[in-house]
């Protein structure tokens, strides 16, 4: 009988801010000096969908809890690294991670710094766990188009292939 858990997998649509483990949420909350529930079940209810969600906006509201946790380069690097660790344990060998860097600029981190931090975490995860991890940078249609353009043109002209080699094709505006 085929055991799906033993098969290697690819993950083609994974959002960084929706993929934090409870352990990393706890670390990030401590780093950000944010109080969170002590019990895992109570914390899980704040960051997970339970049952039917009535609207997209109700679903997206879950991300409001996570956003303040991803406002530093250290936090973003840790989140990206932990995501690769998590999927490696599920036998994922390739992952495309979606990330909207402008959501991590509330504390003066720039978009380029946010992307760089995520790439550092993904690259460390690749090296440590053997998972090919690519970043799909998303621009949000309700925010400043100039920020997305800046990142796009930086990606096209960057002399640093280390920074941009793992960004997939173009920047996506969602």
Residue ranges and their predicted role:
Residues 1-174:
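Metal-cofactor-binding active-site regions of metalloenzymes
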């Amino acid at each position: 009988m085929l055991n799906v858990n033993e098969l290697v997998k690819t993950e083609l649509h994974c959002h960084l801010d929706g993929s934090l483990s409870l352990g990393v949420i706890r670390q990030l909350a401590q780093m950000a000096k944010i109080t969170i529930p002590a019990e895992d079940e109570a914390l899980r209810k704040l960051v997970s969908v339970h049952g039917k969600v009535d609207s997209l906006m109700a679903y997206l509201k879950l991300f409001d809890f996570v956003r303040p946790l991803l406002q530093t380069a250290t936090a973003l690097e840790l989140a990206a690294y932990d995501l690769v660790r998590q999927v490696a344990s599920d036998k994922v060998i390739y992952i495309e991670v979606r990330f909207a860097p402008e959501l991590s600029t509330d504390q003066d981190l720039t978009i380029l710094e946010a992307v760089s931090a995520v790439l550092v975490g993904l690259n460390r995860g690749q090296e440590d766990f053997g998972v090919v991890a690519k970043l799909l940078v998303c621009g949000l249609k309700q925010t400043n188009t100039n920020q997305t353009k800046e990142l796009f043109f930086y990606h096209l002209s960057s002399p640093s292939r280390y920074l941009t080699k793992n960004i997939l094709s173009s920047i996506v505006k969602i």
